[in-house]
C-alpha cells in the first residue's frame, strides 16, 4: 500500500506509515450466474447476484426478487408448479440482477476515474443517468409479466 501512495503528499504518507497492517480492502462480486435455481433450491438477493456496493441497490434488488418469487409461489400447488415458478422467476429476475452486478462494478470504476478519466462533464452526465433503470422500474408490471408467463403453457418459456 505504501508503494501505491508513494507519490502522494506527506500527510497521506504519514497516515499510512502509522498503520500497523496497511492493506487495501477488496470488493468482490459474483460471476454471472447461468441460473438462479436448481431443483428445489432457488436463490435471491446477494445469494443470486452478489455485487459491489457502488449502486447501493443490493437490498432493494433482494426485495424485488422476493416480490416476484412470492407472487409466483402463491400460485404453486405442487412440486411441478414449484419448478415452473422458479423457471419464470429466473427468466424475469436474472437479467435485472446481473445488470446490477455489471453496473455496480462500472460505477466503482467511475468513482475511481477509470471510466471517463478525469472529464468531469462526462462523469456528471454518467452519474445523472446511470441509476434511472433501478429507480424507475415498474414492479407491478414485472409481477404481472411473471404471473402471465407462469400461467402460459411451459413451451412458451
Predicted regions and their residues:
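Charged C-terminal helix
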Residues: 2, 102-120
